[in-house]
From Swiss-Prot:
The keyword Ion transport does not apply. One of its GO terms (molecular function) is rRNA binding. Part of the 50S ribosomal subunit. Belongs to the universal ribosomal protein uL22 family. Keywords: Ribonucleoprotein, Ribosomal protein, RNA-binding, rRNA-binding. The gene is rplV. This is Large ribosomal subunit protein uL22. It comes from Blochmanniella floridana. It comes from the Bacteria. GO terms for biological process: translation.
Amino acid sequence: METIARYRYIRSSAQKIRLVANMIRKKEVVKAINILNYVNKKAALLVKKTLESAIANAEHNFGLNIDKLRVVKIFVDCGPSIKRVMPRAKGRSDRIVKRTSHLTIVVSD
């Protein structure tokens, strides 16, 4: 039985989150949480939070055993970008793009 957890509109770029997501793809959830505990990145906390949500969904909604769960799919998509303008010298301006992303984790036994 597949269980899905999504974390949407994360204020971090998809590229940064994919670095962490690739570490736990196709791993058992217990091992994946151990890996995320020792990764020193902001994205690791975001991925861990979403993974724990997927585990809780599997346990509560379907009564699945945590020890048998694996991360079947994990993917990060780009979300909408927030665009800002930064004034520069001589009347010019630069564009600041604040990127967001959507994280989806699917666990199954």
